[in-house]
Amino acid sequence: MSGFSQERLMQVLLAPQISEKATYVADKNEQVVFKVASTATKPEVKAAVELLFKVEVKSVQIANVKGKVKRFGKMTGRRKDWKKAFVCLKPGQEINFAAGE
């Protein structure tokens, strides 16, 4: 686990990101997209995916997504910024989210 506590790794991955782009990337490049904690680093994301899903990770790319400005009646508000991780799996590895159903 390369020095990360198991408790911290359980808090790094928040949810899989299911969208048109995520599905396209998964089919084309053997990548999986996750919504991760805003304090997460690439090594933490790699260790968390390997621990939770028992797969081998080739690389991790992280993108900071800016929150949108939204209106609530007369008031304007802003959604939180969040972080998205593109996890590239080694050949032959696969994460199937539909298997739990």
Curated annotation (Swiss-Prot):
Listed InterPro entries: Nucleotide-bd_a/b_plait_sf (IPR012677), Ribosomal_uL23-like (IPR013025), Ribosomal_uL23/eL15/eS24_sf (IPR012678)
GO biological process: translation
Single GO cellular component term: ribosome
Alphabetical UniProt keywords: Ribonucleoprotein, Ribosomal protein, RNA-binding, rRNA-binding
Gene Ontology terms, MF aspect: rRNA binding; structural constituent of ribosome
Keyword Plastid on entry: no
Signal peptide: none
Bilayer-spanning residue ranges: none
Family: Belongs to the universal ribosomal protein uL23 family.
Subunit structure: Part of the 50S ribosomal subunit. Contacts protein L29, and trigger factor when it is bound to the ribosome.
Main function: One of the early assembly proteins it binds 23S rRNA. One of the proteins that surrounds the polypeptide exit tunnel on the outside of the ribosome. Forms the main docking site for trigger factor binding to the ribosome.
Protein name: Large ribosomal subunit protein uL23
Lineage: Bacteria, Pseudomonadati, Pseudomonadota, Betaproteobacteria, Rhodocyclales
Gene that this sequence comes from: rplW
